[in-house]
Amino acid sequence: MRGLFSHPRFWLFAPFLGLLALTILAFGLWSYASERIRHDLAALGLTWQSVEPNGFPARLTLDVTAPRLVQENLTWSNPNLTATLMPFNLGLEDSHGVVDFLGAHEIKLPSGTFTVSHSGNLMSLLLAHDGLLRSSFDMRQPVLKGVLVRQKWRPEIHLEAQELGLHIRRSEKQTRTPDPMDVAVQLKNLRVMQPKSLGKEAFRRLDILASVPKLWLQNKLQAGDVLRLDRVTLERKALTLVARGTLKLDARGYVQGALDLNVVNLTALLDALQEARLISPRDRAKWAFLGGLGAALGGDTQDRLSVPLHFKNGRTHLGPLDLGPAPSWR
């Protein structure tokens, strides 16, 4: 053995042998990480037809065919996706992940079955060793089609939009704490093709800034959960509406709470409610009278009005008007 180490040719090839050994070790760790990721995804309920890892050594890319996720109240599938984690560092440092959804999303919920097609859908994630730091989900030209099975007449739903963005973040790197997650939703130029009673042009812009329980990201809702809406901005034709408030999931399955609505253009709001068949002509006249009364007695005007929206005892109330059942979360 001493003769081997003293041989000149050994030291000539020693760097290459060392590099080969390190490459084999790195590939082994890369393969282990690939298997570990697949194991963790399977533990969450994700299945697939096939998974092909590639990208060694700089990154870890998984080409997934026919991924499918099955949970208690959710079934999701997609023809193909590509997930890339870079740099490849075994979770020792923060890593950036990118998921490219190559096909339409098929979603089954208790309320109905839906298909979401698009012209491009990327999700980016910043991952720490203890979980998700932040995530962005961007979709171009989304089209939602489906059927609401809980309704007796099984109405068809057909929505189209220009862009959809969903952004999630947490301020600290402690995933085991019950701290809520900050969520931002951006939707541009939504059009309601079905049902036609809602009007083709739904709104030009919808921005939501909210704080949600962390378990909501895992589709785990429970009674007592609190949703804090820091700001909701909606623009539709001549109507601009800004809302703030707090909502709570009631044990009976309804949403409870209150929102403060700041309305620009009361007439446009009444037009929207009447088009959606939520108010009658008589209700419209009552609201027009109250708007004029508020302008005369308070600081509001008919162009700018503050209106409370309450969800209480399973009903939805806009000021004095009963708009029907409160939203159900179950």
Report the location of each language-model feature.
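Short helix-loop boundary/capping segments
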Residues: 197-218, 237, 244-247, 251-253
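Flexible, membrane-facing loop/turn or short amphipathic-helix motifs
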Residues: 66-76, 103-116, 143-159, 170, ...
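N-terminal type II signal-anchor transmembrane helix
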Residues: 2-41
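N-terminal beta-strand/beta-hairpin edge segment
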Residues: 46-174, 232
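Extended amphipathic, helix-rich lipid-handling scaffolds
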Residues: 102, 119-147, 164-169, 185, ...
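Extended terminal
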Residues: 2-15, 52, 219-226, 232-234, ...
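Gly/Pro-enriched, hydrophobic low-complexity segments
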Residues: 176-184, 191
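Low-complexity, intrinsically disordered segments exposed to solvent
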Residues: 80-84, 91, 130, 207-214, ...
